[in-house]
Amino acid sequence: MWFMYLLSWLSLFIQVAFITLAVAAGLYYLAELIEEYTVATSRIIKYMIWFSTAVLIGLYVFERFPTSMIGVGLFTNLVYFGLLQTFPFIMLTSPNFILSCGLVVVNHYLAFQFFAEEYYPFSEVLAYFTFCLWIIPFAFFVSLSAGENVLPSTMQPGDDVVSNYFTKGKRGKRLGILVVFSFIKEAILPSRQKIY
């Protein structure tokens, strides 16, 4: 009896480990696709926002969900459209991003409050959370790295603004003080960029 009980816990641990690795690999692959196809990703997220808006309107018309919950959901989708304007470059300190994070919390609070008072089967509650609360923030979360330069980029020496100002576009001539400053800059603050 105890041996089978021990085996069941061991198998549960192994299954959770495999599921975790599969989800991590899937998220990694999804992030790679998003980085490669940012225009298509932006279009897909836009369609997801429109779909979520249609679901919210359908819940209001057919299911008589509370006006406050639907109104906050529609306003959140409007904020998501604002985030989509600068996609894939999402600033974590922008008011739009901070507002969207706050609205996600407010939406969850309103949903928990509503579903605590009204009975709905678990599958319907999960459908609401999936389509109206989770799918769009998850898409933005997975695509956060799309705006970053993950791999080091290449540049020619003196390709920055200061070098162009001092040399006035003359690549062959280097001023003495500029060489010293370039050396100090690379010694103190080495860049990740390869210089050819």
From Swiss-Prot:
Subcellular location: Membrane
GO molecular function: COPII receptor activity
One of the record's GO cellular component terms: endoplasmic reticulum membrane
Protein keywords: Membrane, Transmembrane, Transmembrane helix
One GO BP: positive regulation of apoptotic process
Parts forming coiled coils: none
Membrane disposition: Multi-pass membrane protein
Predominant location: membrane
Annotated Pfam families: Erv26 (PF04148)
Chain segments annotated as transmembrane: 3-23, 42-62, 70-90, 97-117, 125-145
Family that this chain belongs to: Belongs to the SVP26 family.
Protein name: Protein TEX261
Origin organism lineage: Eukaryota, Metazoa, Chordata, Craniata, Vertebrata
